[in-house]
């Protein structure tokens, strides 16, 4: 069981809501994934007009919403988006995203740390999307973040765990849940992240852009479960020298 800010989750697969061809398909994929925490961009929610209505199907699914500040270019904009989310959705949970560069969508470490400290002081449950920087993740823990979400590779690229060496360091020293976010492009990537000891993964593009999002959601669900079970069972130590599994000469001496 995964616990974030005192809330328990049976599923360690978190999902997003972007890039699906319809709200119905999104809902079916989320249901198939068994995800219990779903991110939603504040840019897409319009409670007045109901345009691109995400809230109704998500509430029908019974999932916990994790509004994000995607589109924010600095701490001030991110804090505004978080306050708006709290007012509109009635939740303290926020995925903090600040990426001023529209080409690569790299998170701004300085602005993220600044915003995280202020939001934590205001009572938010902050889950920041950041570079796989062990020092930064420790600082974010220190200011009160409920979890850290280091990127595996750039958003939407499906490159997998490019930052693996640094993710290992973050997992090793973390005192809060580590959720691998961005760049997870295949179920095998998700399984590997879980084998490393990550507490959860967040997947959006790989599911939503699949030719069969529902089937892909099922694949990710199973991959995350298997990866976690493998981690808990204990993986064998990686070595450079061959180690025989049976006596090499014993039967020749009989």
Swiss-Prot record:
Keywords: Cytoplasm, Schiff base, Thiamine biosynthesis, Transferase
One Gene Ontology term of the molecular function aspect: thiazole synthase activity
Main location: cytoplasm
Pfam (any one): ThiG
Enzyme active site: 95 (schiff-base intermediate with dxp)
Family the UniProt entry places it in: Belongs to the ThiG family.
Function, in words: Catalyzes the rearrangement of 1-deoxy-D-xylulose 5-phosphate (DXP) to produce the thiazole phosphate moiety of thiamine. Sulfur is provided by the thiocarboxylate moiety of the carrier protein ThiS. In vitro, sulfur can be provided by H(2)S.
Protein name, entry field: Thiazole synthase
Native organism: Shewanella oneidensis (strain ATCC 700550 / JCM 31522 / CIP 106686 / LMG 19005 / NCIMB 14063 / MR-1)
Gene name in the database record: thiG
């Amino acid at each position: 069981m995964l616990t974030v800010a005192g809330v328990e989750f049976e599923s360690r697969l978190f999902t997003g809501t972007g890039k699906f061809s319809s709200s119905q398909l999104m809902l079916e994929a989320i249901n198939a994934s068994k995800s219990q925490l779903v991110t939603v961009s504040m840019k897409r929610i319009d409670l007045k007009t109901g345009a691109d209505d995400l809230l109704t199907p998500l509430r029908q699914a019974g999932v916990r919403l994790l509004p994000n500040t995607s589109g924010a270019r600095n701490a001030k904009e991110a804090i505004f988006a978080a306050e708006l989310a709290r007012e509109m959705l009635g939740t303290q949970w926020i995925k903090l995203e600040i990426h001023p560069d529209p080409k690569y969508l790299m998170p701004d470490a300085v602005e993220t740390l600044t915003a995280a400290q202020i939001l934590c002081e205001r009572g938010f449950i902050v889950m920041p999307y950041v570079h796989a920087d062990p020092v930064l993740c420790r600082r974010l823990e220190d200011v009160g973040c409920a979890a850290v979400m280091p990127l595996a590779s750039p958003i939407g690229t499906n490159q997998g765990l490019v930052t693996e060496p640094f993710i290992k360091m973050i997992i090793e020293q973390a005192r809060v849940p580590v959720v691998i976010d961005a760049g997870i492009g295949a179920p095998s990537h998700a399984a590997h992240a879980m084998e490393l000891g990550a507490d959860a993964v967040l997947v959006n593009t790989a599911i939503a852009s699949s030719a069969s999002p529902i089937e892909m959601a099922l694949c990710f669900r199973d991959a995350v479960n298997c990866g976690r079970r493998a981690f808990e069972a204990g993986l064998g130590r990686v070595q450079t020298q061959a180690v025989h599994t049976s006596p090499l000469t014993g039967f020749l001496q009989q």
